[in-house]
Amino acid sequence: MAKPLTDSERQKQISVRGIAGLGDVAEVRKSFNRHLHFTLVKDRNVATPRDYFFALAHTVRDHLVGRWIRTQQHYYERDPKRIYYLSLEFYMGRTLQNTMVNLGLQTACDEATYQLGLDLEELEEIEEDAGLGNGGLGRLAACFLDSMATLGLAAYGYGIRYEFGIFNQKIVNGWQVEEADDWLRYGNPWEKARPEYMLPVHFYGRVEHTPDGVLWLDTQVVLAMPYDTPVPGYKNNTVNTMRLWSAKAPNDFKLKDFNVGDYIEAVLDRNLAENISRVLYPNDNFFEGKELRLKQEYFVVAATLQDIIRRFKSSRFGCRDPVRTCFETFPDKVAIQLNDTHPALSIPELMRILVDVEKVDWDKAWEITKKTCAYTNHTVLPEALERWPVSMFEKLLPRHLEIIYAINQRHLDHVAALFPGDVDRLRRMSVIEEGDCKRINMAHLCVIGSHAVNGVARIHSEIVKQSVFKDFYELEPEKFQNKTNGITPRRWLLLCNPGLAEIIVERIGEGFLTDLSQLKKLLSLVDDEAFIRDVAKVKQENKLKFSAQLEKEYKVKINPASMFDVHVKRIHEYKRQLLNCLHIITLYNRIKKDPAKAFVPRTVMIGGKAAPGYHMAKMIIKLVTSIGDVVNHDPVVGDRLRVIFLENYRVSLAEKVIPAADLSQQISTAGTEASGTGNMKFMLNGALTIGTMDGANVEMAEEAGEENLFIFGMRVEDVEALDQKGYNAREFYERLPELRQAVDQISSGFFSPKDPDCFKDVVNMLMYHDRFKVFADYEAYIQCQAQVDRLYRNSKEWTKKVIRNIACSGKFSSDRTITEYAREIWGVEPSDLQIPPPNLPKD
C-alpha cells in the first residue's frame, strides 16, 4: 500500500509542470474546442466570429500563463533589481497576433483555425485595440515593455486601466467627430483582475504636525484595483507584467457621513470616486490643468509605490534585517522610470512614505528617492509642460504640497550657495513659479528629484541641456543623458510585414529579430538584382493589399501603381500637416496648368486624431478632407493625384499602412519633434523619408547617409536665426507665386465653395501668427518633393535606396534603447537566460 502523502507533498501536485502545453496543431484545436464550449458556453450553431476570436485568445493565453507564473517564480528566487516603468499611457494595440509571434505559435494557430474552417486573419480583425494612449509617448511605453521582456529584465509597466481609451474618430462632412472607445464592452481576455492586491489611495484631508511625526487626516479614500496583463518576450519564455489600476469606491463610501440619510444617493455617488479611471485625457503635447487629471496622476503613483514597497519588503533579499524596515538597499533593488512628468508625484510620494510612514530621516530619504527615480523628457513645447496651480494641490494633496515646498527650499538654498546674489537664477530654477497664479513646475521637480534625466534623440537631448533645463545642466551636467527612442522589430516588422521579414530571413537568417544591427548585412545586397526584385515585389504586394482594404472600408478606388505618400501622426501645428496640404494644392495646380505633362501619380494619405478641444487641429482635418473633395472629383486630374484622409488612425491601422508606404513624411519644424518613432517604423518597412533635420531624422540620416533620405528645410540654427530676425510670412507669400496661389485658393473658398470663409482662421494663422514657420520651408519642400518624383520614376534606384535604409535601421530597435537605459540609468544587465518552459523542471 502506498505511503500516505504529507500536506507538502500533496501541495507539490499543484504545479504548472502538470499542465500540458500547446505542442502541436491537434493541441491547439482541442484547446480551442474546450474554450468555445466551457469558457464561452457556445456551440458551433450559435457561436459568432467574436466567440471564435475569444476561444482562440483563451487558447493562446493558456500557453502564456505557465511561462508567466514561471517568470515571476524565477524573479522571486533570484531577487534581481526590478525596473518600474511608470506611464499614464500604454498604447498597446492588439494582443493576439503579437502573443502568437512572440511565443512562436503562429503557424500552429494558422493551421488549426484553417482545419476548423476559420480564417485566422478575420479573427485577428475582431480584436479591439487597447488604445490607452494618445500617440508616440504611449506607443513608446508599449515597445519598451516588449523589449524589456525580450531582454529578460525584471520589469513592470504601471499605469491606469482606462475604461475608455483614445476616442474613435469619425469623419462627418469632412469634420472630426469623437465617439467613446468602449474597448472593454465584450471583455478583455488578456487581463487578470487581482482584487487581493487592492490598495487604498487618499485625497483631500488636512495635515497635522505632532511630536511623533506628520499625519495626513480626514482624507477621502479611493481603492485601486490592479488588473495584470502578460507581456511576453520574444521566444525566451520570459513573461513580464503590465499592471493597470482601476478606481473603485470603498464599500462605506459616503455612508460613513452619519448625516447622510440617503443611502441610495450615497451608493449612486460611488461613480464620482470611480470616475478617476474612466477616461484617457485625449491631449497630445498639451497641458490642460484639470483636477481629475491630477487625481489620475496621483492615483497611479500612490497605488504603484505601495505595490513597489510591498514587493521590496517581501522579496527574499529585500533587506538585511528580519523585519525589512531598512530602506538602505531600496535603490539597489528598485528603479523607477518616469515617462514624462505625468508620474512626477512619485518623488514627493516616495518622500512622504519614507519620512512620514517609515520614519526615515529627511536627508536619507532624499538620497534614496534620488537614487531610485529617473526622468525622461518628451517635449520642448512650452504649452505641453505641466504646471499645476498651487491652490489645487493645497486642496487635493496638502501633505505633498508641504513636501514639495521643503524640497524646493533645500534646492534653492543649494543654488544660492553656489551662485550668491543671482536672484534671477533662483526664480528660473524654482519648482514654484510665482505670478498671478502660483504654479508647481513638474519638470523642475523631476529634474531635482532624479539621478538621471534623458532626452529621446540626440538633437533633443542637446536642446534639453542648452535651453529647456540650461540652468539645471550647469548645476549637474553629469545627470543629463540621451537615449534615442526605438521601436520593437517584432511588432513593427515580423508581425506587420511578414513578406519583408521572410525575404530578409532567407538572406541573413533570423538573428536580426533580437539584434537589429544585423540588418547591416543587407548592405552587401544593395546591387543584388534578385534581392532588389524581391523587395520591390513585397512592397507592391503590400500596396495591393492595402488598396483593397481602402476600397472595402472607404469605398475609394486608388491606383496601386501610384506613389503612396503617407503622413500619419497626431494632428498638430508643429507637425505641419499644413505644409503637406500646400504641396498637394501646388501639385494639383501644376496638373491643371499642364494636363498633358507626365506627372508621377501619387496617392497622398494623411491620418491622425486632433485633440477634441484643439480648434486649429480640427480645421486642418477639415482642410485635408476639403482638398480631397476637390482633387478626387476633378476629371482632369484622374488617378494622377488622390488625397485620402485615413479615418481613426490607431496602432492596428498603422500596422497596415506603414508596410504599404513608399514615402514617409516627417516634416516638423526643426527643434520641435523630440524624436518621433513613426519615422523609424517607415524606415524599417521600406519607405523613404522626406523630412527636416529634427528629432531622430537626424540620426536616421547619419546612419543611412543623408543622400539616402530627402532632407530639406531650416536646421535648428536657421529657425533660431529667423526668430531673432523676426519671421514674416508675408515676405514668402509675396515672393513665391505658387505659394500665393495655394493660400489664395484656401482663403477664397476654392476648397469650401459652400462656406467661403471656412478656412479664414487657418489662413490668418499662417499669415500672422505661425509659430512653426510653414511658409519658410515651403520652397525647399516643394523642390525636395520634385526630387522624390524624379527618383520614383527609376524604380531600381529607388529600391536600392530602400534597401540601404532598411540595412541602416538597426540602431532604431527599442532593444538597443532599453539596453542603454539598463546599463546607464538603471544599473542592470540584460540577460539572455532562457527560463525553462513550464513543462520542464526549473533547473
From Swiss-Prot:
* Residues flagged as site, Participates in a stacking interaction with the adenine ring of AMP: Y76
Q: Which GO terms describe its cellular component?
A: axon; cytoplasm
Q: Which reaction does it catalyse?
A: [(1->4)-alpha-D-glucosyl](n) + phosphate = [(1->4)-alpha-D-glucosyl](n-1) + alpha-D-glucose 1-phosphate
Which residues bear the site annotation May be involved in allosteric control?
Answer: Y156
- PTM-bearing positions, type N-acetylalanine: A2
As recorded in UniProt, its EC number(s) are 2.4.1.1
Q: How is it modified after translation?
A: Phosphorylation of Ser-15 converts phosphorylase B (unphosphorylated) to phosphorylase A.
- Phosphotyrosine PTM positions read Y197, Y473
Assembly and partners are described as:
Homodimer. Dimers associate into a tetramer to form the enzymatically active phosphorylase A.
The function of this protein is: Glycogen phosphorylase that regulates glycogen mobilization. Phosphorylase is an important allosteric enzyme in carbohydrate metabolism. Enzymes from different sources differ in their regulatory mechanisms and in their natural substrates. However, all known phosphorylases share catalytic and structural properties.
Q: What is this protein called?
A: Glycogen phosphorylase, brain form
Species, as recorded? Mus musculus (Mouse)
Gene name as annotated: Pygb
